[in-house]
Amino acid sequence: MPEKQDNKGFWNRYAKLYDFEIKQFSGKAYLEMYRMMGDYLSPDMTVLEVATGTGLIAVNIAAYVRHVEATDFSPKMIEAARRKKAPANIKFSVEDAAVLSFEDGLFDAVIISNALHIMPDPVKALANISRVLKPKGLLIAPSYSHGHISNSTWNLNAKFLKLIGFETFSKWTPDEYVAFIGQNGFQVKRLQVLRAAFPLVYLEAQKVE
């Protein structure tokens, strides 16, 4: 069986449109996410964001924490993020979720938003996230939900996206997503579905020792 290919080429091409698309289709949900993240983040925390894109989340949660390492595997996304007027406590860098370069137990919290379903190996990504989290560290992992729209609509959108170079490797209902996170070393603490063009499942979980 051929190895699954990642979406890096797509994201490199898409970097210039990323902020516009998020605002257009998920803007209100993202504003609610920032507020919800602020409920649990604190000024003493060092936070890693995986799949930061152009840094939208990092920029909006930086005031809640001590430091944010904001990473993405797309160099073009990181270039776009670095062009922003970002708070001084954010560092942007290119990193692959499957082979994170950070030392074990470094971060109080890890944020990975709308990314696990588009990764060829989300289990490996979660294992790396768990490795760099402190004991009982916080995982914040919002993800677009499959269960709130029809299979035909989802499949039609997926086919169109694949034609332009984007592939979805996993599709989960909210219950399936909770089960997936739980099977990979985390205990889900909070779950809420936010309205967006694709409904957004906001999830917080704690690393299980």
Feature locations, PLM:
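A short SAM/SAH-binding and catalytic strip from SAM-dependent methyltransferases
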Residues: A109-P122
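Conserved class I S-adenosyl-L-methionine
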Residues: M1-S42, L56, A80, K84, ...
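A short acidic, Gly/Pro-enriched loop at the edge of an enzyme's catalytic core
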Residues: A98-A109
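Glycine-centered, small-residue-biased loops immediately flanking beta-strands
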Residues: M45, G137
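C-terminal alpha-helical "lid/dimerization" subdomain adjacent to the S-adenosyl-L-methionine
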Residues: P2-Q5, E21, I140-N184, K189-L194
